[in-house]
Amino acid sequence: IYRPVHLLVVPKAHFALDYHGAPGLRITPVLSADLKTAEIHAEAWVTGTAQSVQFTLGEETLSAPVTDGKAECTFKLENVHLWDGVNDPYLYKMQATLDSGDAVEANFGCRTIAFDAEKGFILNGRPYRLCGAARHQDRQGLGNALTEKEHDEDMALLREMGANTVRLAHYQHAQYFYDLCDKYGLVAWAEIPYITEHIPEGRANTLSQMTELVVQNYNHPSIVCWGLSNEITGSGKTEDLVENHKLLNDLCHKLDATRPTTMAHIFMLDANDPLVFLPDIRSYNLYYGWYVGEWDQNDAWFDEFHKNHPDAVIGL
């Protein structure tokens, strides 16, 4: 056990506890073109007999009937306060309650994201240059059994160095750290532990872990992409490996239509390989100036890639 343990006591009618480990409340903000207003779509899953769910956002409460274990409603939000990265990471809070007394709540942010081959990452309609680091949830003497103290220290280090983004490598991290990313405005890349070597017998495991990653973390405004794998061709490439990535890619799009997919390729993989272009965004782990070569070789590599694939979004 390397995460906090909670004992949950709920009435017979309660928000679903077995929906892939998610809180039972999903929130999807849809902003207007001018970013001034938004429709906030809320969905809740219920176990047991419940007639309705009361959703509360600010001073407004909407009641929605429960049909086949699910209730949903839409709020109209005026004068939207954007979640704007490290500049202004504003969070809204929504609560859902049942007549039985059970309640859940979730933070969310209103923001738009896009990726452009020329302008890079676009946050709320403007280019937003991403500079940061990959973070492992690990400490000497603790392994990955980190407490809030260590999570806070890692976030403080990222902020001290001026980072505005973090890749959460290479597995699902603690909810507390995703919350910190939301709070402090760090743009996050979240991914599953599918690394270096493809194991055909592990397909069900990868699909299960991706489902849990997306469903559990859907509400976090800091997360802008889902990572399919890391340097997965390090031990070779097979048709089954490619097929598994197609399944993962399709699964992400099915579970979440609001975020793109990505994967980090090992630097030995040919930049014209079809696998490079399977996810929505491609990325490379280049080691020039670290393991091999000189730092300025990174510039030459990306210039060549962009010349050959001018419409492809690429990250380092």
Residue ranges: model-predicted function:
Residues 1-180, 184-188, 209-212, 222-228, ...:
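Secreted/periplasmic carbohydrate-active enzymes, especially glycoside hydrolases
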Residues 279-287:
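Structural signature of the urease/amidohydrolase superfamily beta/alpha-barrel
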